[in-house]
């Protein structure tokens, strides 16, 4: 019969996983800065260093930065001023977000929203394997999605310097 509803088709499909609680956690940020400056009418300097450590709200996500900056301004002659600026930063992080395809195109964030709450994290028939049977729903298990992305690291070193002579 077309349009008929089978009331027993969804038996056993009770809420068992709160995907938001499983995937999201409290983030944490530590940020430290120190600087020193001094000078007189002939020479001035400024030095600073910093450290930033952020642990993200998704498991395994983070961002760390070490930074250094130096500015020196020197009046060598009444007609010549020399300035030098240098800044360096070392950044490393893992955003934990890689876009998938199809129903997984939003990565972890959308899979948390779209994965049914009746789906268990682990496959009941295959211990230590993530559950992939969502009764016809084509979505990657959010926990598996996170596990696959934990080594998605980005590393960047930046050095910016300038020198100026002003006559």
Name each model feature, range by range.
Residues 1-16, 56-61, 67, 71-160:
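Surface-exposed loop/interface segments of Gram-negative outer-membrane beta-barrel transport/assembly proteins
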Residues 16-27:
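Periplasmic N-terminal accessory/gating domains of Gram-negative outer-membrane beta-barrel systems
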Residues 17, 42-49:
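Transmembrane beta-strand segments of Gram-negative outer membrane beta-barrel proteins
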Residues 25-41, 50, 144-166:
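Outer-membrane beta-barrel transmembrane strands
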Residues 30-32, 41-45, 78-82:
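Outer-envelope beta-barrel architecture signal
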Residues 49-55:
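Transmembrane beta-strand segments that form the barrel wall of outer-membrane beta-barrel proteins
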